[in-house]
């Protein structure tokens, strides 16, 4: 599981220590959780190659962090490291007032990143050989890839906390989000048990299966994903329209309902969709695309939103 | 010959209508289709929902596949005849790159809240395709100084490269639409019910009709421009007209289906290997074979990863290439 690469740097040993500490902390936190299983599974698989080190004292914590991932940005601010962030990428827009720049996480430009003189770079995907570039110039980094499950997200909160010198706040944050999610599950009161749903990523019917991070959140409520029939095509398959209609989901969630996007009305007008249970019962719901696509501290908000939808459903 | 091919195409379309991800039994689908015939009354036993799946989702998709395949194949055959170049295909003059640019701009604008509804992307793709080919033609004429087709083709290469660069640039700037753009570029027989079919039908009809009208003229022109001119044909005008209608049809079908490769080049060649190079048979058979080929490819796209989709552009290339090599081998053996 753990790919440990040889880091060519004077402080390689220290960094390995930091990695071990961060991982241990993740495990400890996970173990404190509600009977959690081994978090190392899931599609988020690899342990992040955290080349960043845990600060020896609060004064040593990185003070010029550059974040290239909207999820990472949200986590950084949520653990209280916001004051140490100098620049975030063009997709990061939450919380309000983050220092958004034209840096890109998809096509990272090493020179532009180094222009901010970062002492820590946080990113999710190693696009454009970013990692080896940062290695070459000796800038510490922390990679936070999309986790396979919620526990994986909690681990990342903890990691960010350790690396930025906010381990305690991160620990609290994990507790809060856990609390929020279990409260949401209680509020739903089993209303989702056995209901089927379809989570729409875009109008061409790209979706998620239960194996995805977001699919896991739905599973907490006992919801059944119609896309699981297509899990042979990965965690993010594109479903055929006739299958979605014949699977007849009880609920449809739209993650493509931003301005100019889809809406319950536009879904009802699709050929053959008018008779789908979710459309007939008015159970087509627009979700905030940012909240559904990021694995940050707002997972709890998503869980609450789902709970609200289930609780408001007639006949529950 | 043509009647037999038409029967095969009909059989392919019918078979494709029986196959799908929603588990309707083929016999009840057949009964439902027969029930729609005048004076026939059969109870298919399908629910209202299942009938909607058949009539509003599956059948339009099959019909759209037939229209797109027929148009790409006949446009490819026309291009090959006009440019006297066996490697010409309908995308030669930049229509696909232009359409890709138009579609990408509109998808991105839509994500940013342009809100032109579901018509926005096809209209933008269509316009982009037409503009790109017009630019190719005008550039080719202005720099070519009457040096004919080669310069036009090279101008097409330049225009396509430029449009691709612009398309990539736009795509990189707006990462959140990346998946939608990518999916469009790979091609998908859009399933907007009958609206896509009615949208492209006039263009498809005009394109096929005009190209078929000129099938004998193309045969004469293949002998040589001087001989054609002596029979009262004006080759330059015929070429311009045929390129214009082939482009129009291609831009129309690409605007609803995305970029589906390989059909415009493989199908005419496969037909040629069977019936020879004469346009009189080649063009109508390309229409029928193109329709069959793309509908079959879509059946594969719908079944191989069912209930997920496989992009049809992947299928046309994956089944088209080996099939083509087999035909080539048999064809060369026959001569």
Residue ranges and their predicted role:
Chain A
Residues 212-235:
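His/Asp/Glu-enriched short active-site or ligand-binding loop at hydrolase and phosphoryl-transfer sites
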Residues 64-126, 223-226:
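A short, structured surface patch at a secondary-structure boundary
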Residues 73-78, 93-97, 205-209, 253-254, ...:
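Short, solvent-exposed loop/turn elements at domain surfaces
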Residues 69, 125-126, 146, 201-203, ...:
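Short secondary-structure boundary segments
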Residues 152-153, 157-162, 171, 251, ...:
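Structured C-terminal subdomain patch of bacterial secreted/periplasmic proteins
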Residues 129, 143-160, 192-217, 260-262:
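Extracytoplasmic ligand-binding site segments that recognize negatively charged/polar headgroups
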Residues 2-71, 135, 166-198, 308-316:
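Bacterial Sec-exported substrate-binding components of ABC uptake systems
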Residues 109-123, 139, 240-255:
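Proline-aspartate-enriched helix->loop->beta-strand connector
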């Amino acid at each position: 599981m753990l790919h440990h690469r040889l880091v060519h740097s004077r402080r390689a040993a220290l960094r390995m220590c930091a990695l071990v500490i961060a991982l241990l902390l993740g495990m400890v936190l996970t173990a404190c959780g509600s009977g959690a299983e081994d978090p190392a599974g899931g599609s988020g698989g690899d342990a992040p190659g955290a080349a960043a080190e845990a600060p020896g004292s609060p004064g040593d914590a990185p003070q010029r962090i550059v974040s290239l991932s909207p999820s990472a940005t949200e986590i950084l601010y949520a653990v209280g490291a916001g004051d140490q962030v100098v620049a975030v990428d063009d997709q990061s827009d939450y919380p309000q007032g983050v220092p958004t720049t034209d840096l890109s996480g998809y096509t990272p430009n090493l020179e532009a990143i180094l222009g901010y003189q970062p002492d820590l770079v946080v990113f999710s995907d190693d696009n454009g050989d970013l990692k080896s570039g940062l290695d070459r110039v000796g800038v510490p980094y922390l990679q936070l890839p999309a986790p396979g499950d919620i526990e994986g997200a909690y681990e990342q909160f903890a990691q960010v906390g350790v690396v930025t010198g906010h381990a305690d706040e991160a620990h609290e944050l994990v507790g809060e989000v856990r609390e929020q999610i279990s409260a949401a599950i209680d509020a739903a009161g089993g209303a989702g048990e056995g209901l089927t749903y379809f989570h729409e990523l875009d109008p061409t019917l790209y979706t998620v299966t239960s194996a995805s991070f977001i699919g896991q959140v739905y599973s907490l409520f006992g919801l059944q994903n119609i896309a699981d029939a297509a899990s042979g095509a990965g965690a993010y398959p594109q479903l055929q329209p006739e299958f979605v209609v014949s699977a007849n989901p009880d609920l449809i969630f739209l993650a493509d309902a931003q301005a100019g996007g889809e809406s319950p009305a536009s879904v009802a007008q699709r050929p053959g969709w008018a008779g789908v249970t979710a459309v007939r019962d008015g159970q087509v719901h627009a979700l905030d695309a940012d909240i559904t696509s990021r694995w940050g501290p707002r997972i709890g908000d998503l869980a609450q939103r789902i709970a609200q939808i289930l609780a408001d459903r007639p006949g529950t | 010959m043509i009647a037999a091919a038409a029967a095969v195409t009909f059989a392919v379309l019918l078979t494709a209508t029986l196959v799908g991800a929603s588990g309707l039994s083929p016999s009840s689908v057949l009964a439902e289709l027969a029930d729609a015939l005048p004076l026939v009354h059969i109870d298919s036993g399908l629910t209202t929902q299942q009938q909607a799946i058949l009539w509003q989702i599956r059948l339009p998709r099959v019909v759209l596949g037939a229209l797109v395949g027929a148009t790409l194949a006949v446009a490819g055959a026309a291009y090959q005849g006009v440019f006297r170049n066996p490697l010409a295909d309908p995308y030669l003059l930049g229509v696909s790159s232009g359409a890709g640019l138009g579609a990408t701009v509109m998808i991105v604008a839509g994500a940013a809240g342009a809100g032109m509804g579901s018509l926005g992307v096809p209209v933008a793709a269509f316009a982009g395709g037409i503009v790109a080919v017009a630019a190719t033609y005008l550039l080719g004429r202005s720099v070519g100084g009457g040096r004919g087709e080669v310069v036009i083709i090279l101008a097409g290469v330049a225009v396509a490269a430029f449009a691709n660069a612009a398309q990539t640039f736009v795509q990189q700037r707006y990462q959140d639409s990346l998946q939608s753009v990518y999916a469009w570029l790979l091609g998908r027989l859009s399933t907007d019910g009958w609206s896509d079919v009615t949208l492209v039908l006039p263009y498809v009809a005009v394109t096929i009709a005009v190209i078929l009208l000129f099938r004998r003229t193309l045969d004469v022109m293949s002998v040589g421009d001087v001989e054609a001119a002596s029979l009262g044909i004006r080759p330059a005008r015929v070429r311009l007209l045929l390129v214009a209608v082939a482009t129009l049809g291609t831009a129309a079908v690409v605007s609803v289906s995305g970029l589906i490769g390989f059909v415009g080049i493989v199908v005419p060649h496969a037909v040629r290997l069977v019936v020879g190079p004469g346009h009189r048979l080649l063009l109508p058979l390309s229409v029928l074979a193109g329709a069959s080929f793309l509908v079959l490819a879509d059946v594969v796209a719908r079944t191989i990863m069912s209930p997920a989709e496989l992009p049809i552009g992947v299928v046309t290339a994956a089944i088209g290439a080996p099939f083509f090599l087999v035909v080539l081998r048999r064809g060369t053996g026959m001569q």
